[in-house]
């Protein structure tokens, strides 16, 4: 069969790469894709917003399955449109995707259905929000209600930071309509976990856990980004804790969305904090995380097409996972997540080892050269028997990649590796 992946980033490159391994798949198309994906897919110059063209392309090219990568087309109703046209598609409807599209709606669902999360209030008035922050005190978390490409969250450690964030969102329109309403929530302490699942109605098939690194710079410094690296598994969490998160959060959320008449089909992503009181939800996404996908899908031994098709056919597929660890580091353009230039030359990728995974997010071919064409540009990952080995291998490979315009964090996975070392010493 032919499959179509909608999107253009590193996540979509990974999904296309996984589809290309399936014996069922003849051709993988990605719309619009990027030039770095041509190893596994044919890129099609159609915007992810152009529903008419995408539908026409799917019909003309006998696409047997379409997979929607990013959140923006999901919230624009691309899945509803494909279904109306009789095309098989994997992703949530517009109504179901609101679990990501509106943080206040997600919070309301959690409150109604007793899904563990931090306490919160919603504001549209700057003065009321400011008064609330001053009454509650810091640290406190301020979030734009709508989509802000992973950058609409501020963990304010001082009153000044909190008020500046509220001013940005409610007065300065920093995120446009997405920030016209803000969610102010309790600051949760603990270890973070990204837990994703294949979902169809009440059927929830969890994946292995991952942890991403949101801050731009080493030591978790700097502004929030879409994610600067990730690893899987997450040794800080036991199998019992992962099972608890599935039973107390993922399954009840799928059931809650059924109750809300917003039945969810697709990838449900829970960003969790493992607190002293157990797992609590920080956020939901209605799609694969980026960069978590780039370290989770390489561990999936099962055929991705079989998993999705059996789920859509009402079955419960069993997933087979590789025990090995995967650690990936994002190379981003200097200036990201703020303003940055494009067009920096990238060299050295051809010198990387054959088993090194390279997923392209923002690259472009100009004549014979590969150049930067986005904020997050590449993710380089390695698979090894331990996180420590995977980390050492990745950073050795990154020494071969040359570009004047790129930076990356030097500490992806370090905290987990250090904690692992301490726990194994105490076990001896």
Swiss-Prot record:
The entry's keywords: ATP-binding, Ligase, Magnesium, Manganese, Metal-binding, Nucleotide-binding, Purine biosynthesis
GO biological process, one term: purine nucleobase biosynthetic process
Cofactors demanded by this protein: Mg(2+); Mn(2+)
UniProt pathway annotation: Purine metabolism; IMP biosynthesis via de novo pathway; N(1)-(5-phospho-D-ribosyl)glycinamide from 5-phospho-alpha-D-ribose 1-diphosphate: step 2/2
Superkingdom to which the source organism belongs: Bacteria
Residue ranges annotated for the ATP-grasp domain, each copy included: 107-313
SMART domains per UniProt: GARS_A, GARS_C
Catalysed reaction equations from the record: 5-phospho-beta-D-ribosylamine + glycine + ATP = N(1)-(5-phospho-beta-D-ribosyl)glycinamide + ADP + phosphate + H(+)
Pfam families linked: GARS_A, GARS_C, GARS_N
One GO MF term attached to the UniProt entry: ATP binding
Co-factor remark: Binds 1 Mg(2+) or Mn(2+) ion per subunit.
Documented EC number(s): 6.3.4.13
Enzyme class: ligase
Binding, Mg(2+): 283, 285
Residues where ATP binds: 133-194
Family: Belongs to the GARS family.
HAMAP family, per the entry: GARS
Record's protein name: Phosphoribosylamine--glycine ligase
Gene name per UniProt: purD
């Amino acid at each position: 069969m032919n499959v179509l992946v909608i999107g253009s980033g590193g996540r979509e490159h990974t999904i296309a790469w996984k589809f290309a391994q399936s014996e069922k798949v003849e051709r993988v198309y990605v719309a619009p894709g990027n030039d770095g994906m041509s190893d596994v897919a044919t890129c099609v110059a159609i915007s992810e917003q152009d529903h008419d063209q995408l539908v026409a392309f799917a019909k003309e090219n006998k696409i047997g399955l379409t997979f929607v990568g990013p959140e923006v087309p999901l919230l624009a109703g691309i899945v509803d449109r494909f279904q109306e046209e009789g095309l098989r598609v994997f992703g949530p409807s517009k109504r179901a995707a609101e679990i990501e599209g509106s943080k206040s709606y997600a919070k309301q669902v959690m409150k109604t259905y007793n899904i563990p999360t931090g306490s919160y209030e919603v504001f549209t008035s700057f003065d009321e929000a400011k008064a609330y922050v001053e009454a509650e005190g810091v640290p406190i978390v301020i979030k734009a209600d709508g989509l802000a490409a992973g950058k609409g969250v501020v963990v304010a450690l001082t009153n000044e930071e909190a008020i500046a964030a509220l001013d940005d969102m409610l007065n300065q329109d920093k995120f446009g309509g997405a920030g016209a309403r803000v969610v102010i929530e309790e600051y949760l302490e603990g270890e973070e976990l990204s837990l994703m699942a294949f979902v169809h109605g009440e059927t929830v098939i969890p994946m292995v856990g991952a942890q991403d690194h949101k801050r731009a710079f080493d030591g978790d410094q700097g502004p929030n980004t879409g994610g600067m690296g990730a690893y899987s598994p997450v040794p800080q969490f036991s199998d019992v804790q992962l099972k608890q998160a599935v039973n107390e959060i993922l399954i009840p959320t799928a059931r809650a969305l059924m109750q809300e008449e917003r039945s969810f089909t697709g990838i449900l992503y829970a960003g969790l904090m493992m607190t002293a009181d157990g797992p609590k939800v920080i956020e939901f996404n209605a799609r694969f995380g980026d960069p978590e996908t780039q370290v989770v899908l390489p561990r999936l031994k099962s055929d991705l097409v079989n998993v999705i098709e059996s789920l859509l056919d009402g079955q419960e597929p069993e997933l087979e996972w590789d025990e090995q660890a995967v650690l990936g580091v994002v190379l981003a353009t200097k200036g990201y997540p703020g303003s940055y230039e494009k067009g920096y030359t990238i060299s050295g990728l051809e010198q990387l080892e054959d088993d090194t995974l390279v997923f392209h997010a923002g690259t472009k071919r100009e004549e014979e050269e590969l150049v930067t064409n986005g904020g997050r540009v590449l993710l380089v990952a390695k698979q090894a028997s331990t996180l420590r080995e995977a980390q050492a291998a990745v950073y050795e490979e990154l020494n071969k990649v040359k570009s004047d315009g790129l930076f990356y964090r030097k500490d992806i996975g370090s905290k987990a590796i250090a904690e692992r070392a301490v726990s194994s010493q105490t076990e001896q």
